[in-house]
Amino acid sequence: MSTAARVFVARLAGAGVFDPKADQVGRLRDIVVLLRTDRKPPRVLGLVVEVVGRRRIFIPMTKVSAIDSHQILVNGVVNLRRFEQRPGETLVMADLLDRHVTLVEPGEPKSDAATTDRSTVTVMDVAIDRQAYSDWEVSQIYVRLKGRLRRRGESRIVDFNDVNGLTLPTAEQGAE
């Protein structure tokens, strides 16, 4: 099984997670990312996998050896401790999908995008790319624009930097 360079997260929902001996560990339920305060794309920390008994565990991306659209291959020892979301962590399927964000039009400043009905889009899917040394980052976002009169709007794939609303707000320090 070869590792895909880019994978869309919603297509992985429910995919089987296997160990090197082809025994099923569980099924993928979500992907954990770390949103950043700067304009850098979120970094993928790991997978939330549902094992026997509907128990959800965390598998770090360093243990993932291959990702395909239908299955995920992990190596090493898997810790079966129950997954608990930490502060600063964001679940892609639970928190990012169906979120309303602002689409930055070409020529518009990235931080001062005017929010209009036309520039507000809904996140439908998120693409993650493999970087060097087993690091994965969010690279592209599949969005849907608002349609007219209860119709679906146009959908398109945009780069992460072309949307506002998926980064953490910067902490302002005031001198008083």
Residues covered by each model-derived region:
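Peripheral interaction segments used for macromolecular assembly
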Residues: 1-176
